[in-house]
Amino acid sequence: MPTEFISLTFPNASTELNPIPNAAIDPEFLKRYARNLDDYEYNYTLVPYDSSYFDPWTVGATIAAVTTKLKIIIALRPNTLFPTVAAKALATLDQLSSGRAVVHFIAGGSDAEQAKEGDFLNKQERYERLEDYIKILRRAWESAEPFDWDSKYYKFTQFSNRVRPVNGTIPVSVGGSSDDAYRIGGSLADIFGLWGEPLKETKEQIDRIYAEAEKAGRTDRPRIWVTFRPIIAETDELAWAKAHRTLNALQSNRATGQGKVPANTPPPQNVGSQRLLEIASRGEVHDRALWYPTVTATNARGASTALVGSPETVSESILDYVDLGADLISIRGYDNLSDAIDYGRNESSYLVRYPTAQCCAGHKPRSHFLQFSFTQRQRRCQLWSLYAPSILAFSIGS
């Protein structure tokens, strides 16, 4: 299956580098952002969730209305919507978008964050509830007959759903780095999301996920989604200078209370963030170009690991993860809209997903960051032969 790319849709011009306090939705910005992702052939966009943030369903429906190809990943916390209601809402969005809906589950990694919306289950209970939730969704989409449910977390009788997904079901994504996340995602998810860790640790996590899938008796395995924050410039030297400017801005914003994480924030409770901070304590740079000071600058809040370097360096770094089994790569920078356009448009960002068969036939690939569908090792060889003539022409804003 080809490698696919994911971005994240932002509803206004506020960024981590230049935050706009209490920024409201800018409808025209949101529509322009979504159209750019569609035009530059991103495959998916994640619509995030936070207790204090905009409603992802409304934002997702807006994205669906102004795009034609982009798949819309709705981030969903089970405590926010009863599963039978979510089944209909997702299927409705799927019909409105002609089969482009995806759901990404967040079990909840912070007791304090969950409590803000009335959820007082502990972490283990939240994962148990998530397991029920996914099973209910699948049954609601597939069952031809009304059905009952009676478990610790949900109880209902004779639920009948007439709102069906376009393709019979909707892809389910799960993320996390805990044993419960591996078990539930490995056994039930279509996609499993990971944050960018060094290759060794990423391989260990993928092996855990695959082992859980096998233990559950699956004949398939979840697709692996890995997230990075690329910082790219024409040369490695320029990229590192840009990276340090980015880090200085993140640190300054946090110190002045403008960052997404206050300076006095306690250590994170979720395992994924704890893992990132532990890796950061071992050194700044891992493998080819994986950079961790952005993790400590944000207290590992969400996806925060950067890939730093020239287009060649960053593309080779991502291909290392593709070789491990990652076939969904999330890329978003720190200057949200500009970076999304640069990744999609500029030759300087040139990750290629051009079909092997067409390359072998002599067709010229589009010069496009998101053109990326070689088989794993063939990608590496053909990247250079296809793009060597134009590498010297690459340029990117620093």
Identify the function of each model-found stretch.
Residues 22-36, 176-184, 310-320:
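Short, acidic/polar
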Residues 38-39, 61-68, 90, 94-100, ...:
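Acidic (Asp/Glu)-rich catalytic clusters
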Residues 2-4, 9, 117, 123-165, ...:
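An alpha-helical appendage that flanks or caps ligand/catalytic pockets
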